[in-house]
């Protein structure tokens, strides 16, 4: 490799590092409250259409429930809802806006959730995913969720729910 090629390669790497540093400083993850239920409903309506507006509103009042969002430039691009009961947690909702998928935001949000579970001494984290959602299945496997069961004809389209579990070692 000549000096010019080496210089250009290093310049490109520096630009990439600088861009990533600026970009990650624009990302935040925080618990949100009932004032933002409309934004949750909008994200859900644009992605997996899981809950009605009324269901979203009620999520914020359930005991042991947290609604957490990942924000890019202070705009919500993803959400999870988790309910904790003693030493178990159930993910009842996890989604990233379509145009922000496969860019690492879901992984950042899941990592945040897992760290939160570890702080709370959760022994297992549970979720269900449609058998037709192979991308989500791969995503959850990346975080060591194992298939532990199935609910037949669970979703409106007749597909089964695949039950997943992640155990935390103490």
Residue ranges and their predicted role:
Residues 23, 27, 31-99, 110-112, ...:
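Acetyl-CoA-dependent GNAT
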Residues 92, 118, 135, 157-158:
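Short secondary-structure boundary/hinge segments and terminal tails
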Residues 59, 132, 155:
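Positions that flank functional sites
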Residues 63, 136-137, 159-160:
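Short Asp/Glu-rich motifs
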Residues 97-111, 120, 124, 130-138, ...:
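Conserved glycine-rich acetyl-CoA-binding loop
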Residues 7, 128, 141-162:
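Conserved catalytic-core motifs of GNAT/GCN5-like acyltransferases
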């Amino acid at each position: 490799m000549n000096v010019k090629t080496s210089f250009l390669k290093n310049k490109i790497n520096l630009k990439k590092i600088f861009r990533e540093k600026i970009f990650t400083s624009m990302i935040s993850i925080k618990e949100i409250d009932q004032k933002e239920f409309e934004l949750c409903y909008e994200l859900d309506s644009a992605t997996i259409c899981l809950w009605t507006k009324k269901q979203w509103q009620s999520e914020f009042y359930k005991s042991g429930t947290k609604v957490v969002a990942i924000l890019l430039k202070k705009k919500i691009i993803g959400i999870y809802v988790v309910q904790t009961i003693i030493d178990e947690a159930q993910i009842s909702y996890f989604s990233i806006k379509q145009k922000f998928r496969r860019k690492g935001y879901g992984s950042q949000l899941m990592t945040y959730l897992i760290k939160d579970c570890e702080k709370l001494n959760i022994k297992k984290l549970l979720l269900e995913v449609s058998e037709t959602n192979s991308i989500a299945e791969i995503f959850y496997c990346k975080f060591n969720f194992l298939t532990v069961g199935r609910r037949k004809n669970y979703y409106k389209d007749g597909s089964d729910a695949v039950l997943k579990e992640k155990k935390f070692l103490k």
